């Protein structure tokens, strides 16, 4: 079992990565003893893992569950209220703990519920998708979507522990695994050139779910994110680099309807647009754009935005992006493989040229 620490002073917490960790009561015991436990999961994950995790936790306290519909389109205030209603109807107090058992949607909603309920109760992340294991479960970003924008209603709120059981990936649909790889590849582009090269060399091992390759890839992503979050918890500086591909990607998700494009698929196409924007600005050359496209394609990810989206549909969503300052769209762009920066002086005419030519 691999352990990584997210260093945030009194809010520090461990990430555990390994096989069969959902049956590891010893690791969970210190976070659950004598507490009331409410597991939040969805209709897809519940038949696979809910009974297993309930049995693991049963010796620590009273365990109940809330099962939500599965999909990004249900990450909203109405379904957040379902969690609050369960907590209130069953008289959960401040000594309770919420457990997020699922992917990024479940993790984001459960964390936000924990941040809000009685002004804050403990929560635990048990991510079951690759995307949530390498990205959304770590760092304390919690939120729900609004029809006018993704993740616009939320809070920074850290979990007590992140428990990553790599065996969950064996029940993950291939499309969901590919979507997670978009976030994995992002880390190589924006932070670690050696890791990007390793990904290029290990496509087959990852696609066949080789145990060692999975643990290394997930661990490296979590190490990078833990490092970044420890430096900049609330995204005032370097943490913004983790949004590579996301400004374009969130626009795709919002325009196409949440759930029609998976988050990772939108990030993949958005990452290519970011790379093409960087090339248009003279920050990188065509060879880097090609390497990025080839690696994304190797994992069966989309590298073009939907044909139905034009510049106007992109720009209306990008103007609502959370990174906008003083009315200026701020983009995370690669400056090399392994490096990125935030740029606020990208003109709309440049963006229009890139989007029209993509």
UniProtKB/Swiss-Prot annotation:
Q: Specify the domain of life of the species encoding this protein.
A: Bacteria
Where does the protein end up? Answer: Cytoplasm
Cite the NCBIfam families for this sequence.
aroB
Hey, which family's this protein in? Belongs to the sugar phosphate cyclases superfamily. Dehydroquinate synthase family.
One GO term under biological process is: aromatic amino acid family biosynthetic process
A GO cellular component annotation here is:
cytoplasm
Positions of NAD(+) binding = 70-75, 104-108, 128-129, 141, 150, 168-171
Q: Which SUPFAM superfamilies match?
A: Dehydroquinate synthase-like (SSF56796)
Broad enzyme group: lyase
Q: Which cofactor does it need?
A: Co(2+); Zn(2+); NAD(+)
**What is the protein named?**
3-dehydroquinate synthase
Gene name in the database record: aroB
Pathway in which the depicted protein is active = Metabolic intermediate biosynthesis; chorismate biosynthesis; chorismate from D-erythrose 4-phosphate and phosphoenolpyruvate: step 2/7
Tell me, what's a Pfam family for it? DHQS_C
